[in-house]
């Protein structure tokens, strides 16, 4: 990755300089606005600690949720400021706005080693504007917070696939560097994209075939096996002629799945049994059947135990594994066995077969934590679901491309 990194910035010296860091604190919150998964916050700490220890005046920005360009208390970064303070062991102030009077006053008042968190950048409609002039004006205002001799560090890997102001446009206005998280994520994904050790297995789950179509097309030539579970597997099974009853289905993608099976059928590995629910509810009645015994009027919420076994056999022989998307509705304990079983098979392959295993962010990373699995059992857990998929599809990531300038 031919870009300047945090090491380059630290070598230049940051003592007394304002450094704006774009992190990704788009974390899940419960109804009491408590953070339920601190993974992305923990991942941001190495860059922030390195800067504060070197005497920088650090200004951090992030989005949270989709407030649609309006101030909305529900999406305030207050819980993030609190969590950062706890994790860093130092007070992290939260500005009352993004580029308003409070943000400027607090930025001007920073001393060496201080951290200021701006309020949710998506409270300003210009953050996600399609109008380059609007984004440019917002970028000017953000850059102004850094005063003279400021710098920008891109460390929110989960957003580098978006050409948004705080990710892309601001990098045109300040000396720019890749933070440790972004640098590490890119190097891991480059290893998989450019030189994966065979056998290379891709595990795809999640709800929609349409979301993963690009990655199937891109990886079919490189991967030895593509395991498909989760909501997207039902469209493939339907394309094979199986009855999936009321399971999630993308009717408009059935012909596409038929085409993929015709072209890559020797690589695509599908479930051989399914776990069914009488309704979409965590306490629904549950049945496991083979593919030809679908219970009338039910819907499948997970793969079955024979499928886990089949997938585990493939994974156990693999040397490179990329996993993106759960195998079922893991949030419901009764329908979490498929995701747990496949995740454990990846952990086992990593330990016993020396596999290089990457969890591609998003719901997969969340499931590892929710199910209490050993995070250290994987070679790498990415913080970016969409970004990691787009990288492996060979797409240019705007937030990375702009750093190469």
Swiss-Prot record:
GO cellular component: cytosol
Pathway(s) annotated for this protein in UniProt: Carbohydrate degradation; glycolysis; pyruvate from D-glyceraldehyde 3-phosphate: step 2/5
Transferase keyword on record: yes
PROSITE patterns recorded: PGLYCERATE_KINASE
Binding-site positions, substrate: 24-26, 40, 63-66, 122, 162
Subcellular location: Cytoplasm
Keywords associated with the record: ATP-binding, Cytoplasm, Glycolysis, Kinase, Nucleotide-binding, Transferase
Gene Ontology BP term (one): gluconeogenesis
Residues annotated for ATP binding in this entry: 212, 331, 361-364
Disulfide bridge map: none
Subunit structure: Monomer.
Family, similarity comment: Belongs to the phosphoglycerate kinase family.
Protein name: Phosphoglycerate kinase
Species lineage: Bacteria, Bacillati, Actinomycetota, Actinomycetes, Mycobacteriales
Chain's gene name: pgk
